[in-house]
Amino acid sequence: PWLVQMGQDRGGLYSYERLENLVGLKYHNADRIHPEWQRLTVGDVVRLVPPGWLGRRDGLALPVAQIIEGQSIVLRQQPPQFAFDAVWSFHVMPRWEDRCRLLVRSRSRMRQPGEVLGAELAGPVMALMTRGLLLGIKRRAEQAWRVNRPPA
């Protein structure tokens, strides 16, 4: 449920909200599951950047390319609507009966030397924000599990 409600205009990215808002992203990370945000289908978009941010008229929103309920969400941007082809995916892998592992993968196809340089410069920021996202989801999921687990 946490992954389905991701987005700048929904549940946030569960990362470093103050840092995101310091650069004007206007994130509000949800600390509960919102029933109104629990439906996500192929073709919907997950907004990462609000309209107008740093001159981006439409902001940045990644379309949902594939979704397998309770298992994975794949977001993909590609030409001609976007400058380059990129995929950001989330995969929930069951571990034992009461645990799971969340894998986050990203890749992009770069055609110009400047794009490669940009990706290398953005790498540390992406790593930091991905770590924040993983820790934020972990904290929320574990907290919900502690509250809702059956008595021992």
Per-segment meaning from a language model:
Residues 1-44, 140, 146-152:
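Hydrophobic ligand-binding cavity/cleft-lining segments
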Residues 46-52, 73-80:
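Short beta-strand segments that buttress and anchor functional surface loops
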Residues 53-61, 82-85:
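Short coil-to-beta-strand transition motifs
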Residues 67-68, 79:
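Acidic/polar residues at beta-strand termini and the immediately following turn/coil
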Residues 68-73, 97:
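Short, conserved beta-turn/loop elements at beta-strand boundaries and strand-helix junctions
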Residues 76-139, 148:
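Beta-strand/loop substructures that line and gate deep hydrophobic ligand-binding cavities in soluble
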